[in-house]
């Protein structure tokens, strides 16, 4: 699993919808957590002054969130658990926003209680769950596996609500109320052993409460006697000893109660569905206990409520509220009532310690203490919340933002295509658009970045599709767009011409899909158009014709499948029915429902089902947190309805599509528009492109040292002269641009027969392996060098804490990276199904940040402390590799960027690595050789490349310098301290940059800051000398790694090479032969290396 996906959110000026369905305050009273109908969780900062600010959105559920609860002892592990309507459960670390565990069970939970008895239980405790199933489930809080269940001996039923009775005087018990109004009690303390032994555990007591629709049950911990039970139309107070009724209060004015809490002895708080709340004092009635009722029992002392206070609330009966109460156990010991609305608003009331009524006895009104919405964050930080195409689009609505209704990113062309509400389509370079949006000097990027505007639609553009991204056999210039008027246009995006218009005569086109490669009709793949009126149309692009119009579906289309043998189109609908269409004739062959429909769909399950077929990088296919929002408006690309699944060529894409270091994800917030875009930086892939391949990772079945020698062989074939540059120091590292130059990777190895031939004047190499019948070569991978290095610089610009000190100018001068316009919203893909994004103004409640670092791109105050600890661990001689005084500044700049990215990857991998694995990896790295007095930059980067390969592949064969062992231990410890990945990365980056800038004080620097206009030309001029350095480093790699059989004196070269030396170098690929040795994978070495290596051989 790739864990190096960093993200930057470009939100736009309108906040995404967040319809609150669940709310809680964490035990440390520093954070509010809300779950939404859209499936996302939101973390809100809560200050000691009870000020609120939205901090982070967590993407992990594909359905509406039903409940939230703590999942650990919060003082030890800040974990909470969330449950969704479709049975998904996630355990989150709310400190760093990462999902630590996820499971999907066939249960819909409506309430969860955490229980742990330290002296009787092992593990992390239990999650006691109730919902739309019988009785109570017991789920392991760590693994989310079902451990056992509490069963009912009589009248098993669904459970509406529950609470845990925990007291030092009595045993722990679980109290529940069923949908039929049955109160049941299970003993927890005495049931632990029985549950661990999988024995049935039944209730010890039950009582019918004579009311329905129970909302809340609460035990009074102050008196350990009263029991509050809130129903929708009344609330009651019982004596916990024998469950006798003490009080009944019926709702008035048509209000429906939603919950309640015991806030003090004989004092309760009740709230309603429309957000009103009331505080009552329970008073004794004064009835004598000597009065006996007719049945002979002793009459219990009865009580009656006295209304003390009520809370002020805006009258809005159309917005249901979810509410809760928190009694702070830490200073300043606030009692807080909180609510969340479907509109996304959070409101807090500070409940006084001693609520009192007015002098005339009427209830006193408690004012609202704080209220906040996501939009408030966006309004206060409008510069942070700009859209990615604001600089390029002249299309503005009243709010000043581009009205984008659909969006598509083409990684192979680095083009972002945005369809707008007025029918125009904007095409721009995505990386340039991101730089213009985020970096200072964006106007220069805007002026130098061409963009196109396509005009052809008369209605809003609702869907886009780039067919070549799904099948390389289709024309690279084709693009499809659909609109509200049921018109689909085939474009040539290079010439901006309209090739054809398809008029479907149906509803708005909500999704454009493509058949898999195995399904072809008339020699070509088919385009499937799904419309909002439940109709489906098939288009033949080559023939410019519409093959099928299927209009008889009664429910929204949920699934599209293809039958390649009989040319059938299989359409699955939301009611689980199936329609089978014959494509050639356009007739409906069959219509099935129920079990037959499920069988038909399962029989066609031979290819991958996905939510969307839009061409995105494979890592974004793995991180499906945004694609798979089945019941929410958060979807990647326009989908026809929640949960649409199509059988497509994405299985083929997964095999053919190579991950790229930079991607753009459009995220839908409504069916008709794109709310924001996410920039994805694949740190692992970026390091792969920039670091040299470690020699230990070279497959013996491949040609000599892979792609670099292939390139050299090609240059020999083309009769290009190879030159070596004279240098006093050891050969330097590969430059970033040179390494990122487009090359073709060798085919995938394994049990296949791999042959490589490069023929010129008899030059031929061949390596044979075990023969296999099936051969699936790895796809060719071409990466633009300038795009790679620009991506690396933009990534570093986004992470550097600009404005912390006076090093900004030095970073711009020596690293040639531009400063950010302001703080940005960072994010992280923590798991294959989970994603977290910071919101604009996430640090509003952090008074220290506002006071000391206002407007600084500092992730948290903790970053500076972590950076100091990291710097203290660094030995004096360890830092960014130097020794490049004789090289041009552009090469030093590239080497520094390579080194910084490799360090960031190391940090990212270690922080995400499990502790036991990190310890095992750390113990496997030991000192293998004595450091030279003068450290070579090439050796540093090769060491990092070797260690990177170990972390990526899980091997323990590589070695790092001893100095890195202490850093490895330090970074591994950060995981246990709930340090966020972005915090750790920013801290290490800042420490390394500071070390580098300090070292530059001893090195003469002749470079000047490069302007944006000169940046591109400068990088192009640097390519040629860096290619020469690549040759030099390759020979240095051989010298450092492969010991010679016989000592050979170094050969000195003049700057003017004679013809004999040139001929030797031209013939060198012919001599780069790995002969079979007695030890598998161990090459024999030849003395010819010394003839071409300008460095001293030791």
UniProtKB/Swiss-Prot annotation:
SMART domains: WD40
PANTHER family per the UniProt record, alphabetical: RABCONNECTIN-3B, ISOFORM A, WD REPEAT-CONTAINING PROTEIN 72
UniProtKB keywords: Biomineralization, Cytoplasmic vesicle, Phosphoprotein, Repeat, WD repeat
One of the GO biological process terms: protein localization to plasma membrane
Name of the protein described by the UniProt record: WD repeat-containing protein 72
Organism (species): Pongo abelii (Sumatran orangutan)
Entry-linked Gene3D superfamilies: YVTN repeat-like/Quinoprotein amine dehydrogenase
Keyword set includes ATP-binding: no
Function: Plays a major role in formation of tooth enamel. Specifically required during the maturation phase of amelogenesis for normal formation of the enamel matrix and clearance of enamel proteins. May be involved in localization of the calcium transporter SLC24A4 to the ameloblast cell membrane.
WD repeat extents: 15-54, 60-102, 158-196, 315-359, 399-438, 456-501, 504-549, 552-591
GO terms under cellular component: cytoplasmic vesicle
Pfam short name (any one): WDR72_alpha-sol
Superkingdom, taxonomy of origin: Eukaryota
UniProt keyword annotation of Plastid present: no
């Amino acid at each position: 699993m790739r864990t190096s996906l960093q993200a930057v959110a470009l939100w736009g000026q309108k906040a995404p919808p967040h319809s609150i369905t669940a709310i809680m305050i964490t035990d440390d009273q520093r954070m509010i957590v809300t779950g939404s109908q859209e499936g996302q969780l939101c973390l809100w900062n809560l200050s000691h002054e009870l000020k609120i600010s939205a901090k982070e959105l967590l993407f992990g559920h594909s359905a509406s969130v039903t409940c939230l609860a703590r999942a650990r002892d919060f003082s030890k592990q800040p974990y909470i658990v969330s449950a969704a309507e479709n049975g998904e459960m996630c355990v989150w670390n709310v400190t760093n926003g990462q999902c630590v565990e996820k499971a999907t069970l066939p249960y819909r939970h409506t309430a969860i209680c955490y229980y742990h008895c330290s002296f009787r239980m092992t593990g992390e405790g239990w999650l006691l769950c109730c919902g739309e199933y019988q009785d109570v489930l017991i789920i392991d809080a760590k693994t989310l596996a079902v451990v056992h269940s509490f069963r009912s001996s009589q009248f098993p039923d669904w459970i509406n609500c529950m609470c845990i009775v925990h007291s030092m005087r009595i045993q722990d018990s679980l109290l529940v109320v069923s949908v039929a109004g049955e109160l049941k009690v299970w003993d927890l303390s005495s049931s632990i052993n029985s549950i661990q032994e999988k024995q049935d555990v039944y209730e010890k007591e039950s009582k019918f409460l004579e009311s329905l629709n129970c909302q809340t049950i609460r035990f009074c911990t102050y008196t350990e006697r009263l029991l509050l039970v809130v129903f929708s139309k009344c609330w009651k107070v019982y004596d916990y000893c024998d469950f006798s009724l003490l009080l009944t209060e019926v709702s008035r004015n048509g209000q429906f109660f939603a919950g309640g809490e015991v806030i003090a002895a004989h004092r309760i708080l009740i709230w309603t569905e429309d957000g009103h709340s009331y505080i009552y004092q329970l008073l004794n009635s004064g009835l004598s206990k000597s009065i006996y009722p007719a049945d002979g029992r002793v009459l219990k002392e009865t009580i009656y409520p006295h209304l003390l206070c009520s809370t002020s609330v805006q009258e809005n009966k159309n917005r249901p509220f979810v509410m809760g109460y928190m009694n702070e156990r830490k200073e300043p010991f606030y009692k807080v009532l909180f609510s969340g609305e479907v509109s996304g608003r959070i409101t807090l009331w500070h409940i006084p310690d001693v609520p009192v009524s007015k002098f005339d006895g009427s209830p006193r009104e408690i004012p609202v203490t704080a209220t906040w919405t996501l939009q408030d964050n966006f309004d206060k930080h409008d510069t942070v919340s700009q859209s990615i195409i604001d600089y390029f689009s002249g299309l503005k609505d009243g709010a000043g933002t581009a009205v984008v209704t659909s969006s598509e990113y083409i990684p192979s062309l680095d083009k972002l295509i945005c369809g707008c509400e007025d029918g125009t389509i904007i095409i721009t370079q995505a990386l340039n658009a991101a730089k213009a949006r985020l970096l200072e000097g964006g106007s220069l990027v805007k002026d130098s970045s061409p963009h196109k505007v396509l005009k052809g639609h008369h209605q809003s553009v609702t869907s886009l599709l780039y067919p070549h991204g799904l099948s390389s056999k289709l024309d690279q210039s084709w693009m499809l767009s659909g609109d509200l008027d049921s018109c689909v246009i085939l474009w040539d995006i290079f010439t901006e011409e309209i090739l054809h218009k398809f008029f479907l005569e149906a509803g708005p086109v909500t999704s454009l899909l493509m058949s898999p490669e195995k399904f072809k009709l008339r020699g070509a793949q088919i385009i499937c158009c799904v419309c909002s009126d439940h109709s489906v149309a098939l288009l033949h692009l080559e023939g410019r014709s519409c093959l099928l119009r299927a209009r008889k579906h009664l429910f929204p289309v949920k699934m599209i499948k293809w039958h390649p043998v009989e040319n059938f189109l299989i359409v699955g609908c939301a009611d689980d029915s199936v329609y089978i269409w014959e494509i050639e004739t356009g007739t409906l062959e069959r219509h099935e429902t129920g079990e037959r429909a499920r069988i038909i769909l399962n029989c066609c399950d031979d290819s991958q089902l996905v939510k969307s077929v839009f061409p995105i990088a494979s890592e974004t296919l793995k991180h499906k947190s945004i694609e798979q929002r089945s019941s929410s408006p958060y979807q990647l690309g326009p989908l026809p309805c929640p949960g649409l699944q199509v059988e497509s060529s994405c299985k083929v894409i997964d095999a053919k599509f190579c991950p790229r270091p930079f991607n753009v994800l459009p995220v839908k917030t409504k069916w008709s528009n794109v709310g924001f875009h996410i920039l994805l930086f694949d740190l692992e892939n970026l390091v792969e492109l920039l670091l040299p391949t470690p020699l230990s990772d070279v497959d013996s079945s491949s040609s000599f040292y892979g792609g670099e020698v292939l390139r050299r062989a090609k240059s020999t074939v083309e009769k290009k002269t190879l030159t070596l540059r004279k240098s006093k120091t050891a050969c330097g590292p590969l430059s970033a641009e040179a390494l990122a130059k487009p090359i073709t990777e060798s085919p995938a190895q394994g049990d296949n027969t791999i042959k490589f031939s490069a023929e010129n004047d008899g030059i031929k190499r061949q390596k044979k392996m075990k023969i296999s019948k099936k051969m699936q070569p790895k796809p060719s991978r071409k990466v633009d060098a300038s795009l790679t290095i620009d991506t690396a610089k933009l990534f570093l610009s986004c992470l550097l804490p600009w404005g912390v000190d006076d090093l900004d100018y030095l970073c711009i001068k020596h690293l040639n990276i531009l400063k950010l316009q302001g703080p940005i919203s960072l994010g992280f893909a923590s798991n294959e199904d989970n994603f977290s994004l910071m919101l604009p103004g996430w640090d509003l409640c952090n008074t220290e940040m506002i006071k000391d670092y206002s407007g600084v791109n500092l992730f948290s105050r903790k970053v500076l402390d972590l950076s100091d600890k990291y710097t203290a661990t660094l030995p004096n001689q360890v830092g960014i590799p130097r020794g490049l005084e004789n090289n041009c500044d552009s090469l030093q700049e590239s080497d520094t960027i390579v080194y910084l990215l490799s360090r960031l990857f190391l940090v990212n991998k270690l922080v995400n690595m499990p502790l036991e694995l990190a310890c095992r990896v750390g113990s496997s790295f030991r000192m293998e050789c004595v450091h030279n007095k003068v450290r070579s930059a090439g050796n540093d980067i090769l060491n990092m490349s070797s260690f990177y390969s170990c972390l990526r592949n899980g091997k323990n064969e590589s070695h790092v310098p001893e100095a890195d062992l202490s850093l490895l231990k330090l970074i591994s410890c950060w995981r246990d301290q709930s340090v966020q990945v972005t915090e750790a990365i920013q801290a290490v980056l800042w420490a390394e940059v500071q070390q580098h800038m300090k070292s530059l004080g001893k090195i003469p620097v002749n470079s000047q800051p490069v302007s944006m206009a000169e940046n591109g030309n400068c990088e192009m001029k640097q390519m040629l000398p860096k290619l020469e350095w690549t040759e030099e480093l390759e020979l240095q790699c051989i010298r450092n790694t492969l010991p010679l059989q016989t000592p050979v004196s170094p050969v000195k070269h003049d700057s003017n090479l004679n013809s004999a030396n040139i001929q030797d170098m031209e013939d060198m690929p012919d001599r780069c032969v790995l002969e079979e040795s007695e030890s598998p994978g161990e090459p024999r070495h030849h003395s010819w290396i010394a003839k071409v290596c300008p460095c001293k051989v030791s």
